[in-house]
């Protein structure tokens, strides 16, 4: 992604005089900053779809290494102490058989030598698929969707991993619940991101 990016979420910007995308200008978020490898357009969107829905689990190894190569400096600068994948609901996990965000987080963890903590964040509410919803609908759909393990000892700086950042609703909700649990700073990385304005 070579274009000018939003300094908060990393969406590419059309207007080079701006520092923030329209979404980040309008709202205060629960996370500090985030970045993505690519814009969510073909062929990237096709590859992410195959990773997610067509059992192309080995893509996660390649993409996880790519995340480490591209963002190693950023991750070190953020002072990340643990990597947490965005969880799937139990029913979706049973149906799919794997969590693509967890596979990405595992590979990134191995490359960076930072622990992945997968049993921290839980999806306790079965949500409707987000792909056909606007930002407000996504936010309502995700309200109360996540919980944090009561036995977890919160870290100061956490990195959330997901496959796609569209409106940011998933990252927002997950970051909010982690902060309520005592995390000070939440950052995110995703494979791809929607287009900014």
Predicted feature descriptions by range:
Residues 1-197:
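Glycine-rich phosphate/pyrophosphate-handling loop used in enzymes and phosphotransfer proteins
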């Amino acid at each position: 992604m070579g274009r000018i990016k939003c300094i908060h979420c990393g969406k590419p910007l059309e207007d080079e005089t701006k520092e923030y995308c329209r979404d980040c200008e309008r709202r205060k978020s629960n996370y500090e900053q985030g970045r993505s490898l690519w814009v969510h357009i073909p062929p990237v969107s096709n590859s992410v779809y195959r990773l997610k829905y067509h059992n192309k689990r080995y893509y996660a190894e390649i993409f996880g290494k790519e995340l480490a190569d591209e963002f190693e400096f950023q991750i070190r600068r953020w002072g990340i102490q643990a990597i947490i994948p965005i969880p799937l609901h139990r029913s979706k996990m049973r149906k799919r058989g794997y969590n693509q965000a967890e596979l990405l987080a595992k590979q990134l963890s191995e490359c960076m030598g930072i622990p992945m903590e997968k049993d921290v964040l839980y999806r306790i509410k079965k949500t409707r698929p987000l792909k056909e919803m606007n930002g407000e609908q996504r936010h309502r759909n995700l309200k109360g969707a996540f919980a944090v393990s009561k036995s977890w000892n919160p870290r100061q700086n956490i990195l959330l991993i997901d496959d796609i950042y569209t409106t940011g609703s998933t990252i927002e909700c997950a970051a909010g619940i982690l902060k309520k649990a005592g995390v000070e700073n939440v950052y995110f990385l995703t494979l791809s991101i929607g287009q900014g304005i």
